[in-house]
Each structure stands twice: as structure tokens, then as C-alpha cells.
Amino acid sequence: MLVVKKGEGVKVRVRVNGVWYEKYVSPRTLLVDFIRDELGLTGTKVGCDTTTCGACTVIMNGKSVKSCTVLAAQADGAEITTIEGLSSDSKLHPIQEAFKDNFALQCGFCTAGMIMQTYFFLKEHPNPTEEEVRDGIHGNICRCTGYQNIVKAVLDASKRLRS
């Protein structure tokens, strides 16, 4: 069990988007706040703070997690990928391209979490049906699009990733 005296921070060492970071933070610091405030990676959004909306979705040790209910200290030693880590050489990831090309975003608030959930989902289901896509993104909420274009984008992304 980790014992921390009042006013002391805990050391958190994580690999985010391929880069190791080591910071001292309050034991109560949430992973989403660590990513945004300590690392300056603001693509990951804070929506509900209750794991309901999925805007804070990141990949941690190969699994999709909602970073608003994970303590930064729990992520110590973890490998994390955020939306900023998907693209390379200033080029969009195929999932990002599919979302753009299929008009799968409007206000954009949910987009980073939706794309990260899609990334995880397509690793597990590279050739999904529409029904599987709808089930695979069910924990991520979009108030703007009605999901039709998001589902089309996920199906399109699966084709792009397979070719």
C-alpha cells in the first residue's frame, strides 16, 4: 500500500506516445488531468468525470480506458497512447482520415475519445459488421451526429487498415 504524507506528491513515471515522463503529483490526480495539465496534451477531453461519455478515452497498456476515473498513480509504469500519438510525420492516422472523410464529427468534443475507442476496437475486430461497430463504441457518447457517420467512419477505417 502506498502511504503518502499530507502535502507530499507521488512519483508517476509513464510512457505517453512513446516518450517517458516522470512527474510528482498529488495522490488524487486523475490520469486525464495528468495528461492534460502535467503533460500539456489537451486532445484528451474531460466530459462527465464518471466514465459515462468516453471523451477521456486513452489506450493504456493495450486496453481502452476512461482516464477520468484512473488515478495517475495507478498508471505508474504504464504505456499510454493519446489522440496525439496516433498520427505520425504530420499525417493523420487512417482512423482520423476516415472520420474526416465521412463527416463523423461536428463540434469535435467527443472525437478524440471516439477515435481512441475505435483504435482499440479495430485492433480486436479488424473486419466488423455495423452491429459490432455500434456495440464497440457504445460507451462513447456523441450529442451531435446521431452516430450514422461515426459508424460509417469506423467501417471505412477498418477497410483502410486492412488494405
Curated annotation (Swiss-Prot):
Keywords assigned: 2Fe-2S, Cytoplasm, Iron, Iron-sulfur, Metal-binding, Oxidoreductase
Enzyme Commission number(s) from the entry: 1.2.99.8
Residue sites binding [2Fe-2S] cluster 1 per the record: C48, C53, C56, C68
Origin superkingdom: Archaea
pH dependence (UniProt free text): Optimum pH is 6.7. At pH 6.7, glyceraldehyde is the predominant substrate, however at pH 7.5 the dehydrogenase exhibits activity preferentially towards the aliphatic aldehydes such as formaldehyde, acetaldehyde and propionaldehyde.
Gene Ontology molecular functions: 2 iron, 2 sulfur cluster binding; glyceraldehyde oxidoreductase activity; metal ion binding; oxidoreductase activity, acting on the aldehyde or oxo group of donors
Main location: cytoplasm
InterPro entries (UniProt xref): 2Fe-2S-bd, 2Fe-2S-bd_dom_sf, 2Fe-2S_ferredoxin-like_sf, 2Fe-2S_ferredoxin-type, Beta-grasp_dom_sf, Diverse_Oxidoreductases, Glyceraldehyde_DH_small
Record-linked PROSITE patterns: 2FE2S_FER_2
A UniProt-annotated Pfam family: Fer2_2
Gene3D superfamilies named in the record: 3.10.20.30, [2Fe-2S]-binding domain (1.10.150.120)
Binding positions ([2Fe-2S] cluster 2): C107, C110, C142, C144
GO cellular-component term (any): cytoplasm
Essential cofactor(s): [2Fe-2S] cluster
2Fe-2S ferredoxin-type domain segment(s): 10-86
Reaction(s) the record says it catalyses: D-glyceraldehyde + A + H2O = (R)-glycerate + AH2 + H(+)
Note accompanying the cofactor annotation: Binds 2 [2Fe-2S] cluster per subunit.
Assembly information from the UniProt record: Heterotrimer composed of a large chain (CutA), a medium chain (CutB) and a small chain (CutC).
Function per UniProt: Component of the glyceraldehyde dehydrogenase which is involved the nonphosphorylated Entner-Doudoroff pathway. Catalyzes the oxidation of D-glyceraldehyde to yield glycerate. When the artificial electron acceptor 2,6-dichlorophenol-indophenol (Cl2Ind) is used, the enzyme shows a broad substrate range (glyceraldehyde-3-phosphate, formaldehyde, acetaldehyde, propionaldehyde and isobutyraldehyde), but is most active with D-glyceraldehyde. It is not known which acceptor is utilized in vivo.
Protein name: Glyceraldehyde dehydrogenase small chain
